[in-house]
């Protein structure tokens, strides 16, 4: 009998549409001869299942089940979370699933909450001896002078929401008198803002996952953008070249992969994660930018690219991850 898998997408953030595209990718990747897939859409207004005819039926939040039009009650064996942003990337949905006893594909509540808060995550990684960019955090209502920012971090700086992804609300600021404007822009996306030192170098990203007691480290992707930085437009409107495997030395590749593996273990991750880095031009230690616990899974996203470059079959990888969660519940 096939296992019932909920593809949980949507969410409450500006990354709603991106999440739906990831769900489309996963729907094509996951083995439907082995699993019954159900698209579950979460919005602030409703949690519902999208049926084959395009209609929607509500999720029963008591146990995350639903009733089909013919009266059959469907209970899921596992939830594959592909929400980018709240509540699927910040630990809230994971906590709910923990309470009702439903296995899920991604990191647990603590790891998800930690990594979604960029400043807290980088400070934790710094405490573990991992190199991160210097930054100042501001909460709504707090202020910092332009002189303090420039003296502490130099210019340019990145100003971005402390929580969130897809570079929404992010600005690269090159002159001091534009800092406040960038802070206000970031505050439209979150109540906390990070002002982060710019680190020159090559941007790379590394995916990894653990299943059946074995860690799989994927080839690196090098990110080359014609925009000023890897912003939302570059990510989703083709203003970027993504080169997999990255054009770096084997030694540097191993260094980044080892750091990714170490971070996976430090935060207690599960499922697939992706860690973004800057490689300084002097060959010194890579700088961690952020950790992504629900990476994009469209057909052109980094993780599918890296899986293909590793010579793996993405359907088999998905099966491995799903079975690992089902067998370790």
Language-model segments: residues:
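Residue-level detector of anion-binding/catalytic polar loops
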Residues: 36, 103, 131, 192, ...
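A short glycine-rich, hydrophobically flanked beta-strand micro-motif that places a catalytic Asp/Glu
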Residues: 38-40, 197, 204-205, 270-282
